[in-house]
């Protein structure tokens, strides 16, 4: 995702009314399992869409899995009944919630952690992802063990111009992951963003090969080799998406690889459709 502030603190008004009209009967997404690999979308891709419009877009492009971002469903403002309502919306559309993304602030209260982890279970998944600072990791590991939920830590590229914080507090490098996971429970895991990893100067193919057993979510984006590491449509940048996906297929990696397309937030649907077709070809 483009910025930590954007990702962690994006307004929750886009959730819309959970009582809105459902999709028409029979409108279900086609399965998006290509070559044995489940492809989905990180809902930050559709960050300017309300929930129902996002579901419609996913059905239209043929995606059957979602990593649901807390900008679409804030655990602090969502009742258990509403979590169940949202899950039913996705179920009715043929979309499984593969992971729940909650970007826990460092000062999160215990109740907020409980609501986030319990929310994942209510959505039907035992996988979470989070863009967080290092200091909260020990607490998150405790909650992972409490709820038996695997939580993948998200990485960024902090040479990006938008970043103004202290990169030593964040996750970017292989060593950042190694330090956090050392001595942690089996539930604390990795959410590898291959585009950010490439832009930060690291080889995502080699990292997946060595650490795939600890990765529970992939974020797929195509960043280029120019000075800005610009975001491109899939297949037009320099990120080794095809190589990563072919390796994942070979390894029979059991989790979801999620498209996270950051440009065109007003309507990313055409680019996401292209990404789905690109991945279908790569994995065929």
Protein language model regions, located:
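Histidine-acidic metal/acid-base catalytic patches
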Residues: 2-40, 47-62, 174-192, 198-284
């Amino acid at each position: 995702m483009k910025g930590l502030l954007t990702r962690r603190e994006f307004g929750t008004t886009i959730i819309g009314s959970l009582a809105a009209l459902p999709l028409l009967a029979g409108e279900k997404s086609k399965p998006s399992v290509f070559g044995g690999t489940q492809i989905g979308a990180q809902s930050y891709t559709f960050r300017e869409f309300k929930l129902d419009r996002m579901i419609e877009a996913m059905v239209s492009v043929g995606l059957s899995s979602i990593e649901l971002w807390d900008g679409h469903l804030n655990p602090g403002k969502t009742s258990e009944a509403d979590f169940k309502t949202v899950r039913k919306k996705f179920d009715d559309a043929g979309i499984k919630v593969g992971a729940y993304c909650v970007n826990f602030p460092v000062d999160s209260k215990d109740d907020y952690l409980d609501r986030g982890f319990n929310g994942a279970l209510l959505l039907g998944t035992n996988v979470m992802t989070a863009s967080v600072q290092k200091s909260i990791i020990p607490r998150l590991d405790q909650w992972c063990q409490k709820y038996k939920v695997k939580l993948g830590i998200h990485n960024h590229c902090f040479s990006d111009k938008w970043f103004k914080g202290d990169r030593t507090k964040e996750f970017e490098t292989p060593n950042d992951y190694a330090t956090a996971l050392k001595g942690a429970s089996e539930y604390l895991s990795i959410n590898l963003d291959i585009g950010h990893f490439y832009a930060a100067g690291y080889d995502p193919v080699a990292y997946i090969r060595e650490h795939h057993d600890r990765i529970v979510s992939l974020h797929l984006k195509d960043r280029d080799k120019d000075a800005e590491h610009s975001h491109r449509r899939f297949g037009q940048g320099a990120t080794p998406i095809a190589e990563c996906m072919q390796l994942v297929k070979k390894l029979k990696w059991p989790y979801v690889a999620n498209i996270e397309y950051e440009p065109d937030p007003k309507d990313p649907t055409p680019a996401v459709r292209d990404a789905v077709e690109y991945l279908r070809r790569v994995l065929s």
